């Protein structure tokens, strides 16, 4: 067989990942001395300190993605109906922007003229409908757990520039951290790639 007729194969493991609460033999620790077994548990997510404040009085309905989209629409249109959630969202956006500014200053990327502001971030969240640019999952603007993988973040398209208008996309924290320095369109392609299994 010549080079041009060679078939290249890619092996892909299509075994579905375990869901929370599922175990296999590797997760069970038999304690022969006491005649029982214990199942290793995943660590319990740590609650953010802000959830203990009086201002954090949200029901599970308030934290649903559809409600969070509604709050962003209210902030974007400047017709605020749900005053408390919108106020907390604005405070959190400001805190994140201050963190991004500190990162940019430290790296020498800060440009006060171009740096993203509150209005710009709200517009981006509204335009993205609170979806991650890469994985297309819903991002959370209100979240209870520390290091919540689906919390919203601003990912820089070009990592040699700051968190500037025109250089940002809305991304979940998981995708933002995973992408690192990979070209943004290439990373988006890998996140949206669908592998079809043929029989």
Label each PLM-derived region with a short phrase:
Residues 137-168:
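Histidine-centered nuclease catalytic patch
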Residues 1-70:
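General detector of N-terminal leader/presequence modules that precede the first folded domain
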Residues 46-100:
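Eukaryotic intrinsically disordered, low-complexity, charge-rich
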């Amino acid at each position: 067989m010549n080079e041009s007729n060679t078939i290249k194969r890619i092996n892909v493991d299509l075994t579905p990942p375990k869901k929370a609460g599922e175990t296999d033999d590797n997760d069970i620790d038999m304690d022969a001395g006491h005649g029982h077994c214990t199942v290793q548990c995943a660590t319990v997510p740590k609650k953010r300190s802000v959830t203990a404040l009086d201002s954090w009085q949200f029901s599970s309905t308030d934290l649903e993605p559809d409600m969070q989209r509604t709050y962003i629409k209210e902030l974007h249109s400047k017709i605020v109906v749900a005053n408390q959630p919108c106020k907390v969202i604005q405070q959190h956006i400001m805190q994140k922007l201050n963190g991004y500014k500190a990162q940019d200053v430290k790296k020498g990327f800060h440009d006060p003229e171009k740096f993203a502001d509150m209005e710009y971030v709200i517009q981006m969240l509204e335009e993205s409908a609170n979806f991650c640019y890469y994985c297309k999952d819903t991002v959370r603007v209100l979240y209870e757990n520390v290091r919540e993988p689906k919390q919203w973040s601003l990912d820089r398209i070009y990592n040699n520039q700051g968190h500037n208008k025109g250089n940002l996309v809305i991304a979940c924290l998981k995708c933002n951290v995973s992408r690192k320095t990979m070209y943004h369109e290439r990373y988006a392609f890998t996140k949206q790639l669908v592998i079809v299994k043929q029989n």
